[in-house]
Swiss-Prot record:
It holds the Pfam family Lipocalin. GO terms for cellular component: extracellular space. It is found in: Secreted. This is Minor allergen Can f 2. InterPro entries: Calycin, Lipocalin, Lipocalin_CS, Lipocln_cytosolic_FA-bd_dom, Maj_urinary. Residues 1-18 form the signal peptide. Belongs to the calycin superfamily. Lipocalin family. Tongue epithelial tissue and parotid gland. Gene3D superfamilies: 2.40.128.20. It comes from Canis lupus familiaris. GO terms for molecular function: odorant binding; small molecule binding. Glycans are attached at residue 45.
Length: 180
């Protein structure tokens, strides 16, 4: 049991150390992230968070940037339905790092950004003295989602998540289907 706890602890520490990497802001600024997005894949070191109706099985609807902060409308599974919620991730002194209050405190990082095509972000979530790692792949055009899955897998590996911890979202997902 002690060996298992040590292994889990080391895996989490390695994942958290990856946050110190270089994350460059989009060349044209955060404003380029504004507009419609489609959630296509999630990953987490805690599968319950991204399973259907999990706390981080959320679907980005749209984003906008103002004063260096990111504002997002997301669809959240809630009581058997999907609720549209607006959240704001506040800029920090660190480039491409934001503070987000959602199911605890989150350090949100923009890992890879091509504002016209795809966005990969990850969050380090603190909730009730428990730390979790969650990654999210979004695309502008759903027909190109397969083009960006290898980049998502690579980012996940870099932050300590494994391929078997990735969930590719289907078109049948209820929140994805309830988009405007």
């Amino acid at each position: 049991m002690q060996l298992l706890l040590l292994t889990v602890g080391l895996a989490l520490i390695c994942g958290l150390q990856a946050q110190e990497g270089n994350h460059e802001e989009p060349q044209g600024g955060l404003e380029e992230l504004s507009g419609r997005w489609h959630s296509v894949a999630l990953a987490s070191n805690k599968s319950d968070l991204i399973k259907p109706w999990g706390h981080f099985r959320v679907f980005i609807h749209s984003m906008s940037a103002k004063d260096g902060n990111l504002h997002g409308d997301i669809l959240i599974p809630q009581d058997g339905q999907c609720e549209k919620v607006s959240l704001t991730a506040f800029k920090t002194a660190t480039s491409n790092k934001f503070d987000l209050e959602y199911w605890g405190h989150n350090d949100l990082y923009l890992a890879e950004v091509d504002p016209k095509s795809y966005l990969i972000l990850y969050m380090i979530n603190q909730y009730n003295d428990d730390t979790s790692l969650v990654a999210h792949l979004m695309v502008r055009d759903l027909s190109r989602q397969q083009d960006f899955l290898p980049a998502f897998e690579s980012v996940c590996e870099d932050i300590g998540l494994h391929k078997d911890q990735i969930v590719v979202l289907s078109d049948d997902d209820r929140c994805q289907g309830s988009r405007d």
